[in-house]
């Protein structure tokens, strides 16, 4: 194949765009996706994970958003999830961030908080069990079971759900989240962080009334109260690292908490965030394609564009996109498209999409294979991409 210059295209998907402080060379983004390639104690497997991100930053000017990290010891209780709340964690992530930057790419580190869920075998360790009994564990606004009444992780592991969340607990979460953001940017050298209000997890649970009135009265009841935790956390993070280094992710079509006011809640949040933080790097929204109850196809009436129009620029859309839908969505002003599964199975994805090359199919069975290189760093680059490297 005679390969033309990579970004010569009429489609906006392949054209440069400025996001926050970053000058990207195209509008295809690596979406955050949990992959469990981490030690049981939260320490990332540096060599393995570095190779993964090195491969996926092979096209200069790409923005990569990492899998979600726990910001503190009380942020969650799943095993094999990376953490960033001490110096050892920072030192483990530094080479990963550096590898991305060495490829002239950019990285935002995402943080999440679980709503009080602990994996049951996580408690088999005596030291951990003592911490749980002393209240040093992931917290929930209510102490109620996990989403939809099921207490199981993404791997089908049984979960233990813990304690009511006080105002003091909320303030502690804000502090640990902010400290983690500072570690990400000033310690690891990341370009920014992404705040995670998605899929029924802790911040989402507050906004979508997942706890009813079983919480501190300042943080429940009215929509203004329910939004308070997120807005206070966002303000703290922004004050610590700057608006341009912060992105915000939502899942407006998730029905985890079956909140009849979900649309109004997301509209309220977007307006408040835009009003208070007009220079935020981006808003990142998940399409109604892939949720717990199966595959939902995008329609003209049901997609994220209404939220994009409320927000303005820049805007990232994610969720089940293929090449055609990505090109279509990128025609919207200052819109980027994030890929999760396709970026996993195609380390040179922006190149393949540019030249309409066949895509590797992902292997779902290896998505959450703990600490394994299989289905993680063994997907092949395209021959055409490798040929361009020979020319260089």
Swiss-Prot record:
GO function terms (MF aspect): FMN binding; NADPH dehydrogenase activity; oxidoreductase activity
UniProt keyword NADP, yes or no: yes
User: What GO terms describe the biological role, i.e. biological process, of this protein?
Assistant: cellular detoxification
Which EC main class describes this enzyme?
oxidoreductase
Name what cofactor the protein needs: FMN
> What family is reported?
Belongs to the NADH:flavin oxidoreductase/NADH oxidase family.
Record: residues binding FMN = 34, 196, 249, 341
Reactions catalysed, as given in the entry? A + NADPH + H(+) = AH2 + NADP(+)
Name of the protein described by the UniProt record? Putative NADPH dehydrogenase C5H10.10
Task: Please state the span of the N-terminal signal peptide per the UniProt entry.
Answer: none
């Amino acid at each position: 194949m005679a390969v033309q210059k990579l970004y010569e295209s009429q489609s906006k998907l392949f054209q440069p765009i400025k996001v926050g402080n970053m000058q990207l060379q195209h509008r295809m983004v690596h979406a955050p996706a949990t992959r469990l390639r981490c030690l049981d104690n939260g320490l990332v497997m540096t060599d393995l994970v570095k190779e993964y991100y090195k491969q996926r930053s092979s096209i200069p000017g790409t923005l990569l958003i990492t899998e979600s990290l726990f910001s503190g010891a009380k942020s969650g209780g799943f095993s094999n999830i990376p953490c960033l709340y001490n110096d050892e964690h920072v030192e483990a992530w530094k080479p990963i961030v550096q590898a991305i930057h060495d490829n002239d790419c950019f990285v935002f580190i995402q943080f999440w908080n679980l709503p009080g869920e602990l994996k049951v075998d996580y408690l088999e360790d005596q030291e951990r069990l003592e911490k749980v009994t002393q209240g040093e564990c992931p917290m929930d606004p209510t102490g109620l079971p996990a989403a939809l009444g099921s207490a199981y992780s993404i791997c089908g592991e049984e979960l233990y759900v813990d304690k009511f969340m006080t105002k003091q607990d909320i303030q502690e979460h804000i502090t640990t989240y902010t400290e983690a953001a500072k570690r990400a940017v000033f310690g690891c050298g990341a370009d920014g962080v992404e705040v995670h209000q998605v899929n029924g997890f802790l911040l989402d649970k507050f906004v979508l009334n997942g706890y009813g009135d079983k919480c501190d009265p300042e943080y429940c009841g009215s929509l203004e109260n329910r939004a308070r935790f997120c807005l206070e956390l966002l303000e703290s993070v922004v004050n610590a690292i700057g608006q341009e280094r912060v992105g915000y992710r939502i899942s407006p079509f998730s029905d985890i908490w079956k909140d009849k006011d979900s649309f109004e809640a997301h509209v309220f949040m977007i307006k408040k965030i835009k009003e208070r933080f007009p220079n935020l790097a981006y808003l990142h929204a998940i399409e109604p394609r892939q949720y717990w109850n199966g595959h939902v196809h995008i329609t003209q009436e049901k997609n994220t564009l209404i939220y994009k129009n409320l927000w303005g620029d820049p805007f990232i859309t994610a969720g089940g996109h293929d090449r055609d839908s990505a090109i279509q969505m990128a025609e919207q002003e200052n819109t980027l498209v994030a890929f999760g599964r396709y970026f996993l199975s195609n380390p040179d994805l922006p190149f393949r999409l540019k030249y309409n090359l066949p895509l590797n199919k992902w292997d779902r069975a290896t998505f959450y294979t703990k600490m394994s290189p299989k289905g993680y760093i063994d997907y092949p680059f395209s021959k055409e991409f490798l040929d361009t490297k020979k020319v260089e």
